[in-house]
């Protein structure tokens, strides 16, 4: 496995899952290395000295950090199969815009839903539902955010679906009631082997979130 790309990751991380999905969508074999956040590996600290976070993709001895950056790198490093971006500049710009929306609006809100309580949780739930509705509107009647093909925005968002059950359990609401098209989209994405092999079982995520809440709230 010496010549394979190395992915430094942590199993429940929706950001790490993005890298897994991207690599598998391209058919790239890689070495998966699980990180222990209480004892980060020398390779992680050396590869990402600024943020010291996963995911990090080490390819040809060079580290690529930050999940969306990793996804874009994978698309450019292995261009032969399943392009993640449209061919036109406007389409690519729109894809980057919506992936950025997921990172800036969706990420913070979803954490408040499962990782907070009281007023902060309720505020997060409101933000989450608003973000979900905006994303559903952008999806429209398309099979994927990229149109007919699974792409960059889909990869940026689908990994959160492994957490949907945890959001519903701890936030006490139904995502499908709020956004049926988004749930249908998530099920469509899960039919792809690159996605189904990369996302952990939702019950494991619920147990992980419950343990976090027990220890931190």
From Swiss-Prot:
Pfam families reported for this sequence: GST_C_2 (PF13410), GST_N (PF02798)
SUPFAM superfamilies: GST C-terminal domain-like (SSF47616), Thioredoxin-like (SSF52833)
Disruption outcome: Hyposensitive hypocotyl phenotype under continuous far red (cFR) light and a delayed flowering phenotype under long-day conditions.
Organism: Arabidopsis thaliana (Mouse-ear cress)
A GO biological process held by the record: response to gravity
Gene label: GSTU20
Activity regulation (UniProt): Activated by JAR1/FIN219.
Protein name (database record): Glutathione S-transferase U20
Enzyme kind, highest EC tier: transferase
Domain GST N-terminal: 3-82
Keyword terms of this UniProt record: Cytoplasm, Detoxification, Growth regulation, Nucleus, Transferase
Cellular compartment(s): Nucleus; Cytoplasm, Cytosol
Organism lineage: Eukaryota, Viridiplantae, Streptophyta, Embryophyta, Tracheophyta
Conditions for induction: Induced by a gravistimulation.
């Amino acid at each position: 496995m010496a010549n394979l790309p190395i992915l430094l990751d942590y199993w429940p991380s929706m950001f790490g899952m993005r890298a897994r999905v991207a690599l598998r969508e391209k058919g790239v074999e890689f070495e998966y290395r699980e990180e222990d956040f209480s004892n980060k590996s020398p390779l992680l600290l050396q590869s990402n000295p600024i943020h010291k976070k996963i995911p990090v993709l080490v390819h040809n001895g060079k580290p690529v950090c930050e999940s969306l950056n990793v996804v874009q790198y994978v698309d450019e490093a292995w261009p032969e199969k399943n392009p993640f971006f449209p061919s036109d500049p406007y389409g690519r710009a729109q894809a980057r815009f919506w992936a950025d929306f997921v990172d800036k609006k969706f990420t913070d809100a979803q954490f408040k839903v499962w990782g907070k309580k009281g007023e902060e949780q309720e505020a997060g739930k409101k933000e989450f539902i608003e973000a979900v509705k905006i994303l559903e509107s952008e999806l429209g009647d398309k099979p994927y955010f990229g149109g007919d093909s699974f792409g960059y925005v889909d990869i940026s968002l689908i990994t959160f679906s492994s957490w949907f059950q945890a959001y519903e359990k701890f936030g006490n609401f139904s995502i499908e009631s709020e956004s049926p098209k988004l749930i249908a989209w998530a099920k469509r994405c899960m039919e792809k082997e690159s996605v189904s092999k990369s996302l952990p079982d939702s019950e494991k995520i619920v147990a992980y979130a419950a343990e976090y809440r027990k220890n931190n709230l």
